[in-house]
Amino acid sequence: MGGISIWQLLIIALIVVLLFGTKKLRSLGGDLGGAVKGFKNAMSSEEEKKALEENATDKPAADTAKVTETAKVAETAEKKAESKGKEQA
């Protein structure tokens, strides 16, 4: 029972509208919305930057894995060629 009821909130809202006017409240709401949108854009750009940095550090490891796999394939091909050469001789 210590909380604010819906009627009390409506009376407070009416007083605020009477004091500031609808134009001032509309511009204040637009400014607040623009600030929130700017904050969200800044946060998402920071997350994208971190993701790009993580991908940049992970990429050399992936390239190393490809080189290792290619080396294994080449080694297997050399062994097959050697065994064919021994069979023919």
Curated annotation (Swiss-Prot):
GO terms for molecular function: protein transmembrane transporter activity. The gene is tatA. This is Sec-independent protein translocase protein TatA. It comes from Shewanella pealeana (strain ATCC 700345 / ANG-SQ1). GO terms for cellular component: TAT protein transport complex. Coiled coil: none annotated. The chain crosses the membrane at residues 1-21. Residues 47-61, 75-89 have a biased composition (Basic and acidic residues). NCBIfam families: PRK02958.1 (NF002813), tatAE (TIGR01411). InterPro entries: TatA/B/E (IPR003369), TatA/E (IPR006312). It is found in: Cell inner membrane. It is a single-pass membrane protein. Part of the twin-arginine translocation (Tat) system that transports large folded proteins containing a characteristic twin-arginine motif in their signal peptide across membranes. TatA could form the protein-conducting channel of the Tat system. Residues 47-89 are annotated as: Disordered.
